[in-house]
Amino acid sequence: MIHVTSAPVGYQESLPQRNLALNHPQSAEQQVQAVFSAVLAQFGKQGYVSAQPYAESTPLVEAVATSWEQWFNEFSSTRYSFVADSGSPSVRANKTRDDLRVDYQQILTNAYQRGGYADPSSYVKTLSKEELAAIQQVHHLADPISTDSLSSEAALNLLLPPDAQVDENRDGLTAAGAAYSFRFPDSNTPANVRLAWEATTKDLPEEERLTRVMQIGLQIIIANMHFDSNGQYVRSSQPGDADWVNPQATTGFSFRGMASDWLDYLDGFASQIPPDQLQRDRAFWSSFQANLGLFGE
């Protein structure tokens, strides 16, 4: 199953302030992305391309622990349940919120100090059953983690906080354990596109933000659908298949072009769309297209 997630709004600047964006204080989300992008860079891997460079005086090993703690303190009350049998199969019996914070913090610190990010597929096989259970809870994985056949990306993301996970193979999805998610912005979204997105969505209700994320993800789903000569649906390529494609990774793709395509679609099907929905959709895609231009995409 592919889950859809929307990154929390980080930058809150108005458009006239767009050139000052990198001078703004970092949110917990931005900080964890900056820290773990620096960690991955030490091991020859790409983190968030939109992350600000890590330039703090705090040693990175300490920043690994503190950035996770800050992120957890901000998001744990809304993202995690700590009641066994509450409907979440990943909840650990007799474990508290503080247990999860401390346990995963130690897992992250150990992974950094022991070089686990160099070969995550091998490293996760050294983790104990208890450590894997903590990771399962952090990442909301439905089933216990099997380390035998994980891809490099799926293993790596077990060792990264949720908002620092990366789409390593650029297939448009983020794999963690056996789970896939589509998120936008993701680790490969350029900084100017992320700024345009956040300027466009900062005042939207979360439900509408998720709707817009799903509309962007729909492009990948459609690109992987196959039809016969009569236009009948035959099958869909699955993540990992040789014929799986990510349109956003193709030469010539632009988000402004995608926004233009959505506006063309709305014009073509205007008579079939409820007027209030049509107005909202046109307003969103026109705003996103304009902001992309303002931020230089």
Give the ranges of each region predicted by the language model.
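Type III/flagellar secretion export determinants
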Residues: 1-297
